[in-house]
Amino acid sequence: MTRTRSGSLAAGGLNWASLPLKLFAGGNAKFWDPADIDFTRDRADWEKLSDDERDYATRLCTQFIAGEEAVTEDIQPFMSAMRAEGRLADEMYLTQFAFEEAKHTQVFRMWLDAVGISEDLHRYLDDLPAYRQIFYAELPECLNALSADPSPAAQVRASVTYNHIVEGMLALTGYYAWHKICVERAILPGMQELVRRIGDDERRHMAWGTFTCRRHVAADDANWTVFETRMNELIPLALRLIEEGFALYGDQPPFDLSKDDFLQYSTDKGMRRFGTISNARGRPVAEIDVDYSPAQLEDTFADEDRRTLAAASA
């Protein structure tokens, strides 16, 4: 591909009010360095956990770090798709997105190192076939497909897989698990800070994915069917992953966690995304570019979680 023009030189410059550039500016303003997080007390708290509690927490962290690494490796075709569309603002944001995924991989590995976990951790994923299906097959396949087919429909399928299922259901449920483990027991302060920082980053990621689906649905209503179909394909797989994780621990899950609570939480986060995308049907595409409802949805989820956890800790 040869370059014929530069978007930043066009008349009027860049539209700083567009959602992608709002997200980009937000990421710059909230920059954080993993090296600033103190994991000293986490090691002491870790030693006080039971064997099953350490096993559960290690498995949870393993799922997170492998997922962060997977997206670090797989997101590049989405950048190329944005370039093919001439969407500089989205491409700028996705460079930040990729950097943040790499940083998340770094900080989870730093936490594992800090609590003394150095063995090979692949076995923690071997017992979770749904995880392997999502992260080792569905995610790379739909993102890599953008290299050959950057069409709106392919973008919607890729965004559903990552932004709505992996981040919008599974990662949010994982943060919920960490909060139930850490906040309610006042342990692992480094992990608490880590999750707070990563959660803030990934709210922007999810908002961008919702925005991308909304603009394609607004432009062509056929993409609503693409969105709906892909969500309905993957939601059962995401819920099966939660069930597989709990099945490993029998009738007494570590930390007194509840499978039904987690399934309800994850389902709620998945189902509420349908309405946000549906609301874009028939809308002028230009309106979607400066509609901040995707970011507001993620902030709503975060506020709900804060209130729930505050009530549980009271």
Curated annotation (Swiss-Prot):
It is an enzyme of class 1 (oxidoreductase). The keyword Ribosomal protein does not apply. There is a cross-link at V71-Y162 (3-(O4'-tyrosyl)-valine (Val-Tyr)). GO terms for molecular function: metal ion binding; oxidoreductase activity. Probable oxidase that might be involved in lipid metabolism. Belongs to the ribonucleoside diphosphate reductase small chain family. R2-like ligand binding oxidase subfamily. Homodimer. This is R2-like ligand binding oxidase. The lineage of its organism: Bacteria, Bacillati, Actinomycetota, Actinomycetes, Mycobacteriales.
